């Protein structure tokens, strides 16, 4: 069996084995794994002398490891494993080792197995666990820890034991946590003194002899210190061993000293140990951490080599981690109102002592170092904000802190803006800027006056320098000033982050106006560096309100935008198109009659050149700002078309000129469309894409002309000038021609849907006669359910906006529209996406019918033209109402509301009353014969079909409770319209079918107009019958 098992492992893991042979071997191994006694074979194989191959021993040990950890071996079996492994370890790692130490992967698995044995047996069965492995470290009965292989195994086991029972990063179950705490208590009681002494012995033995041993020892100390007595690691003897390692001079050529860095990390873990405020402040003093950090910052690697390639950024990062831990604890003590005066005084001194070092590391040229101390600086600023009125000792800190934050916002000298190689570095820097912005806001929250004065001076000095140096000025300094202007709005704008409620800081608002004036007057828009131009445009857009009160600056800024729209740098050029639109859109009322000039200036950018993307382009994941593909350029062109629409339709532009400008832009598009349409009809991909782009451009231009306030108040929208509407009617007709020819193409339909929704804003009711053509084109046989749902949403908007003018058009188009929708509702479902689209179509369909009824256009549903689809309409709505499944709850609720509105509108006058003495003597008089009976046999029956559905649980689910609310309303309406017929139907049909009497229900329904009372009865009824 042993030989078979060994051979199977070798075959299974031999890359030269055939697939068939390997499969047989793996199948055999899997069978062996199911044998509860297989671990015995594996233990023997692993400890055998002479040794088996490394792979055989690793697989064997893994199975032993699994047995110890997961199979619940009893005490004798565990003792057998322990004795076998201990005997093997003594032969392999002891002072008189006969065999070579195991490779790293086997040692790792061995250490893990021994750790599991420790967990199982240290309480009882292997009380000498640590003694046994400590004995391996010495060749002279403990006189010195000179056996290297034994020392390394001992340290690995200590590290593994900590990870298993004390690592706070691992989530533990309740029983496991108790077990671990018990084991830690036993270690403290039995062996902690001896283990701590062994660390001293090992450091004394191997310092300057074997860095690997020293580093591993320090890591073990750093792990264990969190849960042992602190005195064991802060004794003078221990510190005499650790501190020289912290400060040792690095003589390596590669500037890396992992022992020194690990020693500093160990200090960090010692400082991070939880303890009372007074003890923590004393610990910081005892360890002389202030002096240590000062010496480290003055070391050659951090001082002399600063700004050179030999700068030791690894050292800077570990020092920053230590300092961040210290400062976090110091601030925590200062925040504690319960600490005594002496402890607080110590914390104050530590704060003053460590702040310069904190700012030095915060200002480090390596952003990783800066980021390491941001948490403690954040804590400090949060504390200062809570203090209220700051004493001088605190207020004096703010200026150097703010200065350091602002300086860190600056691009460093090595940064290369805008290059492909530097994209990731720039993205990381922008993320750092966001974190720095939070710190800067914290300073402003503590002292707004300082913040305003500091940044005003910074910006003022930068513009003074620009005036003196012109284009020779360092772009990084100018970028910093512009970045700070951009952030300054946190104080100066209403409802911004630092503005109290809706009131901005008055002084900040005044200073911002000064900054903006200086910026516009400085000629910065002609600066040669693209980063500055982008910042300039972003600021103009952000502070558009400034131009509303400083009209004199609008014209020069517009001129600058038009210039930058043609900039040679692609990132500036394409970004400027979007920002230009934002600028003119927000200042539409102030830009004046400048459309002719602007159109002439940017007309060279308007011709559309569609390019079918290649497969490589489709796979390119470029960011928006760096994407210079044809598709990205076209999207940018759309911003220009919309901007032209905005500028051309200002209140100061005569209507005839508006129409002229629209025509001048659209005529070339019409011509281009007529040229490409024949090719597009024959399937030419480039021509189809060109038509798509032209349609999108026409729609986007219309969007620019549309009243910007119509979406907020559709009932009070500005009527488009007749001359402008006439021009866009031509656009609508041109698009319809293309749609009619190409409506089998989904992309073309999508572009037409977009254009249609935007043309509504400039055509208003004049588009209504074209609606049948739009429906014919947009709802083709190849239209998806998504497309139908989207178009129904548009029609809801049209019905709402033009309810007084749409009846005749709606009467004409309703039947073909509903027939398309019915076809979509009945299509087979293939997969989750289809199901989601069907749910959306159902919702939009019943919402559309609801909008018709709400706007008193219900007559169109039963008109002569649409009688043929009325029955299908009602049946489809009832089907949706009765479909109580996830994803259809909203549609079901709306459907019952639609049925209630139909009953109210066509059920005739009320023939019954609801109250303490209800009456039901009248004769039903529905709007058309038989509708009263239809309500009973169909609407009423639908209500009770849903209420008997086991998925309908309104007493436990808020969404179905809303459906019950609509059902209750519908039932009361049917009762009011049919009276005694309703009562009789309930008594003879409905309730006998469900096996109960109708009296309680009728009493609840007819005695109160309060729906809640009826719903309460129905909920209780349904709950009792489930």
Curated annotation (Swiss-Prot):
MF annotations from Gene Ontology: small GTPase binding; tRNA binding
Compartments where located: Nucleus; Cytoplasm
UniProt keyword annotation of rRNA-binding present: no
Keywords for the protein's UniProt record, in alphabetical order: Cytoplasm, Nucleus, RNA-binding, Transport, tRNA processing, tRNA-binding
Signal peptide range in chain numbering: none
BP GO terms, sorted: tRNA processing; tRNA re-export from nucleus
InterPro entries according to UniProt: ARM-like, ARM-type_fold, Exportin-1/Importin-b-like, Exportin-T_C, XPOT
GO CC, alphabetical: cytoplasm; nuclear matrix; nuclear pore
A matching Pfam family: Exportin-T
Origin superkingdom: Eukaryota
Main location: nucleus
Annotated family: Belongs to the exportin family.
PANTHER family: EXPORTIN-T, EXPORTIN-T/LOS1
Role this protein plays: tRNA nucleus export receptor which facilitates tRNA translocation across the nuclear pore complex. Involved in pre-tRNA splicing, probably by affecting the interaction of pre-tRNA with splicing endonuclease.
Protein name per its UniProtKB record: Exportin-T
Annotated source species: Neurospora crassa (strain ATCC 24698 / 74-OR23-1A / CBS 708.71 / DSM 1257 / FGSC 987)
């Amino acid at each position: 069996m042993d030989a078979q098992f060994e051979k199977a492992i070798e075959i299974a893991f031999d890359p030269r084995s055939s697939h068939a042979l390997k499969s047989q071997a793996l199948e055999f191994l899997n069978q062996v794994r199911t044998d509860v006694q297989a671990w015995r074979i594996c233990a023997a194989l692993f400890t055998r002398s002479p040794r088996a191959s490394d792979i055989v021993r690793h697989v064997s040990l893994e199975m032993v490891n699994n047995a110890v950890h997961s199979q619940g071996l009893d005490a004798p079996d565990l003792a057998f494993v322990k004795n076998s492994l201990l005997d093997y370890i003594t032969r392999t790692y002891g002072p008189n080792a006969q065999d070579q130490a195991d490779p790293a992967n086997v040692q790792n698995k061995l250490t893990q197995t021994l750790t599991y044995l420790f967990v199982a047996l240290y309480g009882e069965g292997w009380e000498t666990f640590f003694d046994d492995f400590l004995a391996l470290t010495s060749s002279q009965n403990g006189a010195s820890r000179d056996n290297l292989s034994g020392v390394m195994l001992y340290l690995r086991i200590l590290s593994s034991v900590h990870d298993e029972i004390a690592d706070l990063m691992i989530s533990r179950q309740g029983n496991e946590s108790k077990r671990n705490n018990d084991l830690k208590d036993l270690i403290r009681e039995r062996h902690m003194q001896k283990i701590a002494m062994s660390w001293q012995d090992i450091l004394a033995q191997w310092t300057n002899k074997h860095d690997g041993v020293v580093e591993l020892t320090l890591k073990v100390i750093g792990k264990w210190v969190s849960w042992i007595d602190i005195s064991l690691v802060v004794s003078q003897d221990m510190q005499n061993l650790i501190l020289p390692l912290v400060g040792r001079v690095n003589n390596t050529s590669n500037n890396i000293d992992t022992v020194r860095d690990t020693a500093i990390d160990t200090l960090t873990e010692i400082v991070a140990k939880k303890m009372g405020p007074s003890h923590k402040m004393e610990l910081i003093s005892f360890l002389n951490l202030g002096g240590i950090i000062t010496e480290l910052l003055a070391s050659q690697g951090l001082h002399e080599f600063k700004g050179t390639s030999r700068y030791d950024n690894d050292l800077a990062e570990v020092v920053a981690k230590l300092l961040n831990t210290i400062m976090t604890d110091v601030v925590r003590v200062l925040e504690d109102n319960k600490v005594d005066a002496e402890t607080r005084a110590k914390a104050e001194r530590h704060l003053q002592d460590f702040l310069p070092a904190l700012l030095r590391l915060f200002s480090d040229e390596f952003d990783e170092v800066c980021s390491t101390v941001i948490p403690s600086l954040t804590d400090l600023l949060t504390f200062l904000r809570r203090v209220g009125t700051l004493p001088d000792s605190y207020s004096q800190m703010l200026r150097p802190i703010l200065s350091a934050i602002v300086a860190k916002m600056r691009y460093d000298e090595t940064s290369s803006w805008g290059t492909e190689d530097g994209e990731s570095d720039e993205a990381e820097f922008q993320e750092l800027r966001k974190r720095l912005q939070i710190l800067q806001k914290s300073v402003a929250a503590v002292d707004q006056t300082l913040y305003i004065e500091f940044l005003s001076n910074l910006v003022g000095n930068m513009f003074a320098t620009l005036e003196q140096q012109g284009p020779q000025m360092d772009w990084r300094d100018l970028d910093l000033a512009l970045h700070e202007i951009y952030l300054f709005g946190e104080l100066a704008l209403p409802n911004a982050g630092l503005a109290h409620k809706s009131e901005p800081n008055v002084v900040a608002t005044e200073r911002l106006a000064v900054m903006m004036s200086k910026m516009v007057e400085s000629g910065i828009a002609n600066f040669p560096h693209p980063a500055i131009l982008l910042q300039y445009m972003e600021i103009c857009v952000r502070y558009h309100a400034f131009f509303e009160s400083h009209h004199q600056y609008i014209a020069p800024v517009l001129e600058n935008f038009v210039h930058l729209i043609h900039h040679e740098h692609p990132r500036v050029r394409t970004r400027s198109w979007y920002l230009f639109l934002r600028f003119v859109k927000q200042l539409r009322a102030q830009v004046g009659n400048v459309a002719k000039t602007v159109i002439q200036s940017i007309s060279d950018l308007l011709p559309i050149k569609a390019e079918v993307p290649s497969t490589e382009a489709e796979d390119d994941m470029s960011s928006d700002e760096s994407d210079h593909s044809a598709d990205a350029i076209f999207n940018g062109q759309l911003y220009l078309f919309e901007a032209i629409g905005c500028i051309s339709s200002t209140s100061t532009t005569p209507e005839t000129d508006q129409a002229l400008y629209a025509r001048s832009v659209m005529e070339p598009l019409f011509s281009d469309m007529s040229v490409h349409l024949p090719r597009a009809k024959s399937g030419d991909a480039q021509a189809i894409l060109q038509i798509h782009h032209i349609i999108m451009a026409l729609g986007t231009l219309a969007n620019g002309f549309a009243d910007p306030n119509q979406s907020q108040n559709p009932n009070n929208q500005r009527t488009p000038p007749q001359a402008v509407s006439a021009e866009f009617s031509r656009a609508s007709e041109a698009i319809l021609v293309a749609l009619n020819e190409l409506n089998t193409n989904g992309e073309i339909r999508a572009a037409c849907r977009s254009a249609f929704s935007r043309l509504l804003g400039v055509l208003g009711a004049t588009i209504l006669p074209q609606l049948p053509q739009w429906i014919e084109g947009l709802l083709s046989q190849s239209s998806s359910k998504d497309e139908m749902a989207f178009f129904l949403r548009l029609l809801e908007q049209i019905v709402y906006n033009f309810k007084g003018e749409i009846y005749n058009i709606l009467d004409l188009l309703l039947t073909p529209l509903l027939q398309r929708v019915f076809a979509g509702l009945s299509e087979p479902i293939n997969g989750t996406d289809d199901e989601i689209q069907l749910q959306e179509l159902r919702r939009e369909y019943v919402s559309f019918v609801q909008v018709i009824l709400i706007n008193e256009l219900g007559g169109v549903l039963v008109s002569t033209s649409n009688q043929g689809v009325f029955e299908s309409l009602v049946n489809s709505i009832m089907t949706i109402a009765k479909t109580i499944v996830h994803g259809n709850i909203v549609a079901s609720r709306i459907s019952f509301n639609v049925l209630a509105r139909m009953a109210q509108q066509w059920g005739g006058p009320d023939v019954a009353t609801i109250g303490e003495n209800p009456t039901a003597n009248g004769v039903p008089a529905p709007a058309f014969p038989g509708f009263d009976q239809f309500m009973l046999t169909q609407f009423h029956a639908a209500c009770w079909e849903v209420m008997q559905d086991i998925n309908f649980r309104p007493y436990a689910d808020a969404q179905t409770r809303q459906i019950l609310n609509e059902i209750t309303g519908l039932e009361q309406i049917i009762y009011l319209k049919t009276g005694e017929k309703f009562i009789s139907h309930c008594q003879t049909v409905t309730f006998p079918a469900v096996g109960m009497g109708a009296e309680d229900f009728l009493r609840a329904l007819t005695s109160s107009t309060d729906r809640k009372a009826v719903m309460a009865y129905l909920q209780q009824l349904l709950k009792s019958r489930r």
